[in-house]
């Protein structure tokens, strides 16, 4: 069974790892997890200017334990990549704004045989979102020298 998970994955944090782990579990014991990284242009439109570019985000995601396949998404029609990957399940993160029912309706309308499912909500760390990490960095005092940080 192939499960597809999507996201910006801009500054990796424990919430990303948990989302990917839970997404893969939706497919059962022998599931294959395909992760789609949002393009920089998509991240800019939906969230903010990404800190890390799409190619580096793709490389980081490939190293994560639950990930079997990784792709950069397409500009425009988000269903193009779904048609290419052909997942059995599309895992929607608990903090992603997609309406699962509307997504399922669109999949059905397009003849895509995938089931949209929401991953359960879990917060496991204080810095469990990219925005929280950015805010902490902005509020930090960096007066001391850092070693090996060119």
From Swiss-Prot:
Cofactor: a divalent metal cation
A single GO BP: FMN metabolic process
Keywords, comma-separated and alphabetical: ATP-binding, FAD, Flavoprotein, FMN, Nucleotide-binding, Nucleotidyltransferase, Transferase
Involved pathway(s): Cofactor biosynthesis; FAD biosynthesis; FAD from FMN: step 1/1
A single GO molecular function term of this UniProt record: ATP binding
Annotated SUPFAM superfamilies: Nucleotidylyl transferase (SSF52374)
Catalytic activity reported: FMN + ATP + H(+) = FAD + diphosphate
Coiled-coil portions: none
EC number: 2.7.7.2
UniProt binding sites for ATP: 8-9, 13-16, 95, 122
InterPro entries: Archaeal_FAD_synthase, Cyt_trans-like, FAD_synth_RibL, Rossmann-like_a/b/a_fold
PANTHER family listed in its UniProt record: FAD SYNTHASE (PTHR43793:SF1)
Family membership noted in the UniProt record: Belongs to the archaeal FAD synthase family.
Function summary: Catalyzes the transfer of the AMP portion of ATP to flavin mononucleotide (FMN) to produce flavin adenine dinucleotide (FAD) coenzyme.
Quaternary state and interactors: Homodimer.
Listed name of the protein: FAD synthase
Protein species of origin: Methanobrevibacter ruminantium (strain ATCC 35063 / DSM 1093 / JCM 13430 / OCM 146 / M1) (Methanobacterium ruminantium)
């Amino acid at each position: 069974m192939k499960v597809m998970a999507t996201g910006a994955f801009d500054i990796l944090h424990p919430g990303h790892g948990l989302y990917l782990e839970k997404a893969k579990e939706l497919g059962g014991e022998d599931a294959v997890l395909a992760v789609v990284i949002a393009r920089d242009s998509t991240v800019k439109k939906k969230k903010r200017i990404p800190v890390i570019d799409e190619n580096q985000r793709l490389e980081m995601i490939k190293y994560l334990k639950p990930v079997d396949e990784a792709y950069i998404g397409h500009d425009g029609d988000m269903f193009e990549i779904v048609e290419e990957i052909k997942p059995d399940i599309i895992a929607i993160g608990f903090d992603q704004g997609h309406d699962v029912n509307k997504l399922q309706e669109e999949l059905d309308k397009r003849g895509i045989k995938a089931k949209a499912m929401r991953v359960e909500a879990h917060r496991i760390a204080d810095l469990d979102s990219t925005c929280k990490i950015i805010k902490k960095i902005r509020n930090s005092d960096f007066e001391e020298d850092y070693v090996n940080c060119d």
